Amino acid sequence: MEDHGFEELSTRTHDLNVRRLTKGNINFLLSTGQETYSVEDSGLLRILLVGKSGCGKSATGNSILRRPAFESRLRGQSVTRTSQAEMGTWEGRSFLVVDTPPIFESKIQNQDMDKDIGNCYLMCAPGPHVLLLVTQLGRYTVEDAMAVRMVKQIFGVGVMRYMIVLFTHKEDLADESLEEFVTHTGNLDLHRLVQECGRRYCAFNNKASGEEQQGQLAELMALVRRLEQEHEGSFHSNDLFVYTQVFLRGGYSEHQEPYKFYLTKVRQEVEKQKRELEEQEGSWMAKMLCRVTSCLDWHIAVSVLLIVLGLTLLITLINMYIGRWK
C-alpha cells in the first residue's frame, strides 16, 4: 500500500526548503525528513531556466507557473539577482522551476559567481530533469551562443542531452510555423544548437493567457515527458551535484566553514568542466581538420588524375596530328 501521506509531507517539506533558500538562507535542510526524503519518490519535476541575461527567463518561468512568481520587466537587462525557485503543478504533478541570475555571461569567474553557481546547484539538487534554453525568436546572437557554452562549462558537456530550446515572442511567427522557421533558418549557430539538443524545441508567447497559455504549456510538458521517457526518468547529474547532496545533508549555514569549502569545490569542478569542454572542442576541431584535409587530399588526387588524363589525351592528339603530316 502506497504511503501518500509521506509523499505529500515530502513535497511540502521541499516547498518550505525552497522558500527558505530563496530568501538566502543556506541552512534550510533540517535533519527531520531530509535523510529519507527522495525527489524521485515524490515525482517532483525539476526545470532549470538558462540563457543569456535579459532573454526572458523570468517571464517564461511565470508562463510555466501561470502566475507572476518571478520579477520580470520588458527590457533587455536581467532583473534576477540570485537563484529563485518556485513550485507549480501540471495535471496533478508537482514541478519546481528554478530561475537563474547572470551566471552565463562570458566573464571571469569570481567569488560572487561561485556563490551564484553554488546556490543554483543547491536549488535544483540532485539535478534537473530538463534545462530550458530561453532565447528570443529570430534573435539568436553570438551572446546566446556564448551563454550556451557557459551552460556546458557550469553543468558539464553532457547537459545538452537534457536541454530543450524555448523561443520567446512566439507571436512574431505570424503565418509561419515554428517548424518552418527552424528548418529554414540561415543562422548556423542556431541550426547547430537545435541539432545538438536533438531537435527539441517549442515557443512561448509570454503575454498569452487562458487557453493560449494552457496550450503552449501543454506542448512544453509533452516535450518534457518524451525527454523523461528517453532518459527513463533519470536527470542530469555530475560530480558537483553529488557533492552538493553531501553538503546539504550536513545542514550547514553560509556562515560556517563547510560552506566555504563547498564554494571552493564549486570553483574546482567548474574549472574541471571547462577543461573537459575545451578538450571536447579541441577534439571536434581536430576531426573537422582531418575531414577537411581528407577532402583536400581527395580533390588533389582527382586534380592530378585529370591533369594526367588531359596530358595523355593531348600527347595522343599531337601524335595523331604529326602522323597525318608524315
Swiss-Prot record:
Compartment(s): Lysosome membrane; Endosome, Multivesicular body membrane; Endosome membrane
Tissue: Primarily expressed in spleen, heart, lung and intestine and, at lower levels, in kidney, stomach and muscle. Expressed in thymus and lymph nodes (at protein level). In the spleen, expressed in periarteriolar lymphatic sheets. Isoform 2: Expressed at higher levels in T lymphocytes compared to isoform 1.
Membrane-side (Lumenal) residue stretches: 319-326
InterPro entries: G_AIG1, GIMA/IAN/Toc, P-loop_NTPase
Topological type in the membrane: Single-pass type IV membrane protein
Keyword GTP-binding included in the entry's annotation: yes
Membrane topology (Cytoplasmic): 1-297
Keywords assigned by UniProt, alphabetized: Endosome, GTP-binding, Lysosome, Membrane, Nucleotide-binding, Transmembrane, Transmembrane helix
CDD domains: AIG1
UniProt-annotated binding residues for GTP: G51, K52, S53, G54, C55, G56, K57, S58, A59, S72, H169, K170, E171, N206
PROSITE patterns linked: G_AIG1
An annotated GO BP: myeloid dendritic cell differentiation
Family: Belongs to the TRAFAC class TrmE-Era-EngA-EngB-Septin-like GTPase superfamily. AIG1/Toc34/Toc159-like paraseptin GTPase family. IAN subfamily.
Related illness: Diabetes-prone biobreeding (DP-BB) rats have a frameshift mutation in Gimap5, which results in a truncated protein in which the C-terminal 215 amino acids, including the membrane anchor, are replaced by 19 other amino acids. These animals exhibit life-long T-cell lymphopenia, including lack of regulatory T cells, and spontaneously develop insulin-dependent diabetes resembling human type 1 diabetes.
Stated role: Required for mitochondrial integrity and T-cell survival. May contribute to T-cell quiescence. Plays a role in T lymphocyte development and the optimal generation of CD4/CD8 double-positive thymocytes. Inhibitor of GSK3A, possibly by sequestering GSK3A in cytoplasmic vesicles and impairing its translocation to the nucleus. Consequently, impairs GSK3A-dependent transcriptional program and regulation of the DNA damage response occurring during T cells proliferation. Required for the survival of peripheral T cells, natural killer (NK) and NK T-cell development and the maintenance of normal liver function. Promotes the survival of quiescent T-cells.
Subunit structure, as described in the record: Interacts with BAD, BAK1, BAX, BCL2, BCL2L1/Bcl-xL and BCL2L11/BimEL. The interaction with BAX is increased, when cells initiate apoptosis upon IL2 withdrawal. Forms a complex with BCL2L1 or MCL1 and HSPA8/HSC70; the interaction between HSPA8 and BCL2L1 or MCL1 is impaired in the absence of GIMAP5. May interact (via N-terminus) with microtubules.
Name the record gives this protein: GTPase IMAP family member 5
Natural source organism: Rattus norvegicus
Gene: Gimap5
